[in-house]
Amino acid sequence: MKASDILNTYNNAHGGDILDFSANVNPNGTPQSVKDTIIGSLDNIAAYPQIYCDRLRHSIADYYNAYIGDGINLTDNNIICGNGAADLIYRYALAIKPSKAVLVSPCFCEYEEALQCCGCNNIIHYMLDTQDFVIKKDICSLLDCDVDIIFLCNPNNPTGINIPPDIICGILTECEKNNINVFIDECFLDFLNDDKERTCIKEINRYNNMFILRAFTKIYAMAGIRLGYGITSDYGLINKMYKSGAPWNVSTIAQAAGIAALNEKDYIDSTRLLINKEKQYIYNEFDRLKIKYWKGSADYIFFKSKNNLKEDLIKMGILIRDCSNYYNLTDGYYRIAVKKHDDNERLINALKYIFNIYLGNGV
């Protein structure tokens, strides 16, 4: 059962009082300016939205040209907007129609599901617990001329681990040599203090075979709006992606909300401060509880603990993400969102209670 189904079931039975740590969106909530813009845009919903999101694409290009600099010179033509990141993942797969893809595991399940729509054969490169789930150089040995696409997620979901810059560089070089498309999901990179240095957007003019996925969903807490975007220098790919789905896929409200969100610099800064502070609090408490965890870079924490921990926490009104359905992961792997302190404290207290009662740790 999906986390959303469990949440709905529990809310119906218990009056909606469950604390959801399974969805890793910004704990600060949607910016007020975005909410105000949504309300203000209601007068425009009688008309069709801009079919290619012209104003939004222009705003995204301006944002990164100012933020990253380094002469990247993004234009509207480098950008495609979609009905959330998932919409663009499917459009990308349908536009390319690959025969063989390389996936890194564990990873976001939508990549594989989109590729299944194309009848694509997948090669799985497993990241190992014993190697801290870090991609190693040997992945390049899979990138031969028979491969059409590789999907990367930086930082990874669910582990939160960054791909080392030298590994990304090696992958891009090998893929360019063998004419392989590179899909890089950077939807959680906005939570990093050094995102400007880590993003591959600055390499957009160097690698024509690269497509970078971003979204407003997580960083701006806009999951219900459904708004994502992709950046590439392959204009032909963008045209194919437009033809791989329905037109008018981004609503007037979503386009207006995205433009407003891009002006929220202080909001991003305060979010990063909050996430870093609260992650350290959780790390410290996990150390006391002797819970194994991985220090990732995103707004969530990946950890390993007792089997059935999810069920134990649901009984206490807390929902976490069970990661046992990912390739290469078994029972006992979990992911939690980093939330505000009171919520994080409630989770820690629940864990202390569980380990006292069930494990007798005496914590």
Give the ranges of each region predicted by the language model.
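N-terminal "arm"/small-domain region of PLP-dependent enzymes with the aminotransferase-like
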Residues: 1-47, 59
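PLP-dependent aminotransferase class I/II
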Residues: 30-33, 52, 209-286, 291-294
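Short loop-beta-helix segment that forms the pyridoxal 5′-phosphate
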Residues: 49, 62-91
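PLP-dependent aminotransferase-like
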Residues: 94-152
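Helix C-cap/helix->beta junction micro-motif
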Residues: 118, 177-178, 207, 289
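Conserved PLP-binding catalytic core of the aspartate aminotransferase-like
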Residues: 129, 276, 286-317
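PLP-dependent enzyme catalytic core of the Aspartate aminotransferase-like
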Residues: 166, 315-316, 325-363
